[in-house]
UniProtKB/Swiss-Prot annotation:
Function: Catalyzes the transfer of a dimethylallyl group onto the adenine at position 37 in tRNAs that read codons beginning with uridine, leading to the formation of N6-(dimethylallyl)adenosine (i(6)A).
Cofactor field: Mg(2+)
Protein name in the entry: tRNA dimethylallyltransferase
Enzyme Commission number, as recorded: 2.5.1.75
Keyword field: ATP-binding, Magnesium, Nucleotide-binding, Transferase, tRNA processing
InterPro entries attached to this UniProt entry: Dimethylallyltransferase (IPR039657), IPT (IPR018022), P-loop_NTPase (IPR027417)
EC primary class: transferase
Residue sites binding ATP per the record: 12-19
UniProt KW GTP-binding keyword: no
Length: 313
């Protein structure tokens, strides 16, 4: 693999302006963009997933957007395999790969490699989740420490999702999650990446989320959900997690008003952004925090030859 140039990674919460930032960088340094958002891989649902539109993709090559059938399951492992190939092809053309998205697990798999943990049955996982809910996070975390002492000080004790994952892995495989992680191997070195995280203040992000929700509803989201419902997608498909489907379905069934649907979509999006922020705070500590107000200034400092941002703070 040609590793003469760095690979740029751009993360940030939903509605933070990642896609636009990536396009501007790509124009400046002759880059091509690779999707790192688990919902934007699906066909259809362009509006609800906030997939870059034709104008945004104009003159800049975009990869791994809107190519997975809605009825297909698409794993992190599949994304990683395709992404590595895309990176290789882009670098062969002497261009810069720019990965942009909000799916932390995708970035983690690229940087650290993918953990080859055996698939844990859904019934078993649901049992652990129910236990977590009944116990409460504080009590559940203490129980996790007894089961797997190796996880102590490895992550925030208030991180519910990570606690659940650690518990189900240890209890099902009898091997600590961190022993599994130790077995992983990445195709890359950490020095191969320039990792940028758009660090948006919560008040500003809430404002942007509300504006984007309103824009989606005014630009075809309802029609998009009507078409989606006609496809009769299985309920266990990941695409059903796209924010807006459930809420607009309720509206179309006359269960709630459009204003109520809009508010619910905004609330759920804010909750998702909060989870993304927690991931970034606990698992992206080495990433460069980029002030969204100063994005254009950072782009001016970016040079293809060195791919370093000077005076970031």
């Amino acid at each position: 693999m040609d590793k003469q140039s760095k690979i740029i990674l751009i993360s940030g919460p939903t509605a933070s302006g990642k896609s636009n930032f990536a396009v501007k960088i790509a124009k400046k340094i002759e880059g091509e963009i690779i999707n790192a958002d688990s919902m934007q891989v699906y066909k259809k649902l362009k509006i609800l997933t906030a997939r870059p539109n034709k104008q945004e993709q104009k003159n800049i090559k975009h990869h791994l957007y809107g190519f997975v059938d809605l009825n297909e399951k698409f794993s992190t492992g599949q994304w990683l395999e395709l992404t590595i190939k895309k990176i290789e092809n882009i670098q062969k053309k002497k261009k810069i790969p720019i990965l942009v998205g909000g799916t932390g697990l995708y970035f983690q798999s690229l940087i650290n490699g993918l953990v080859k943990i055996p698939e844990i049955p859904l019934k078993f996982r649901n049992k652990v989740r129910l236990m977590s809910k009944k116990e409460g996070q504080k009590k559940f975390y203490k129980k996790l420490l007894k089961l797997d002492p190796k996880i102590k000080d490895k992550f925030d004790p208030n991180d519910t999702q990570r606690s659940i994952r650690a518990y189900e892995i240890k209890s099902y495989t009898n091997i600590s999650m961190y022993d599994w992680l130790a077995k992983t191997k990445s195709e890359f070195n950490d020095s191969d990446f320039l990792k940028l995280h758009i660090d948006t203040k919560r008040e500003k992000l809430v404002e942007k989320i509300n504006l984007r929700t309103s824009s989606m509803l005014n630009n075809g989201a309802i029609s998009e959900v009507k078409k989606f419902l006609k496809l009769k997608i299985k309920k266990d498909q990941s695409v059903n997690k796209v924010i807006g489907i459930a809420e607009l379905t309720q509206y179309l069934n006359d269960e709630i008003t459009l204003d109520e649907a809009e508010e619910l979509i905004s609330i759920k999006t804010r909750q998702y952004a909060k989870r993304q922020a927690t991931w970034a705070r606990t698992r992206m500590t080495s990433w460069i925090k980029v002030d969204p107000i100063k994005l254009d200034g950072y782009i001016k400092k970016l040079k293809k030859s060195s791919l370093k941002l000077d005076q970031l703070t």
